[in-house]
Amino acid sequence: HETRNLAKDVTFANTLKTMRNALYQNLEKTFDVALLPEGLLHDLASQHNLTPADLARDKSLYSIKKLRSASDILLDPNGGGERVANMLRAELPAQRYWAALACLYLGKEVTHNHEEALSSLLKDPSRSVQIAAAEVLATFPINKLGANAALEVLLANADPTISSAYHAVAALNALDHQPQQILEPYKQRIARLPTNDPDVPGRPNGYAARMHKHIASPVPDYFSWEKPGR
């Protein structure tokens, strides 16, 4: 069996929008924080001295309507246009995060059109935004210098003693998404990184260590029976 991704199939565009609307309505009703990456969720809760549950009820910090303006960009078959540019510079870090992910989803041309704005996000106050922008620029680099700068941002955030257990896993995942020929020269540096965040108890502190094992013994980019670029 083979899974067929219908997300970009124009035949199902209206169905996809209907399903997303239902999802957003459910998020509103249940105060679900699914539109926040985990690292950003914990950062915002800590900065404002709120529990995640209270954060979900604070419209100034977590407005699903505002976040939709960024998270829905990836549905635009024309590449988002000015919406991407505006959201990459938006006030809410989650909007900037979703705008960066839209570039990753929409591909090389869209990424290159917004390379300057994405590069500025490598120094964003939010580590979640840094990581998202870095993955985009590492995946669709303008040049080798830009790719290396993006990878260095991911490596810095992959240290949980500098970022957090949550950001470290996000950065390690972004590194793991890179082709093995790109990742191979960095594997020894990754292996030397700490795996524990002294400020995070319990289960989250196991995530980075498991990612280290996966990166050290990866699934190949392509199996022998597959064609590259499939």
Give the positions of each predicted feature.
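Long, internal low-complexity/basic segments
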Residues: 8-230
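Generic structural motif recognizing short loop/turn segments at the entrances and edges of beta-strands
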Residues: 1-2, 31
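Short His/Asp/Glu-rich catalytic/ion-coordination signatures at enzyme active sites or charged loops
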Residues: 2-8
